[in-house]
């Protein structure tokens, strides 16, 4: 039964990472400059999950295999007075869609809650087993 706890815990860690990436996307939704002031619109990130837990050498559970950068099209906004505008007056903004990020956050939350429920069920089973053995 402790394996079940490990599996659910790996999912909690993975979903927490996913939610952190989503929060970064939302926070950078309008960021068009790098930290040093150079023009480079932020690009949305997303988490790629993989089965297993390489830290434990287990084929069960889940882990974050990588955090990828979405190479999708940036969002052009007409701002002819901006120093970052192209020849046609457009400034490219991040490819972050607030609605998509909100749905992804909700999905991560539901997955997190489901794994908490699995942990609670496992703890209950362990408790009953200990009562029987005691």
Q: What is each stretch, according to the model?
A:
Residues 1-134:
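Amphipathic alpha-helical polymerization modules
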């Amino acid at each position: 039964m402790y394996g079940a706890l490990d599996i659910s815990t790996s999912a909690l860690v993975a979903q927490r990472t996913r939610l952190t990436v989503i929060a970064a996307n939302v926070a950078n939704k309008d960021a068009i400059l790098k930290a040093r002031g150079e023009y480079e619109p932020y690009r949305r990130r997303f988490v790629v999950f993989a089965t297993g837990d390489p830290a434990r050498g287990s084929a069960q559970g889940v882990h974050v295999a990588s955090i990828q950068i979405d190479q999708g099209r940036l969002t052009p906004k007409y701002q002819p007075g901006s120093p970052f505008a192209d020849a046609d007056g457009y400034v490219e903004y991040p490819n972050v869609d607030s609605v998509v990020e909100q749905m992804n956050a909700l999905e991560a939350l539901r997955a997190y809650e489901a794994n908490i429920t699995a942990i609670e069920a496992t703890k209950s089973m362990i408790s009953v087993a200990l009562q029987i053995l005691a």
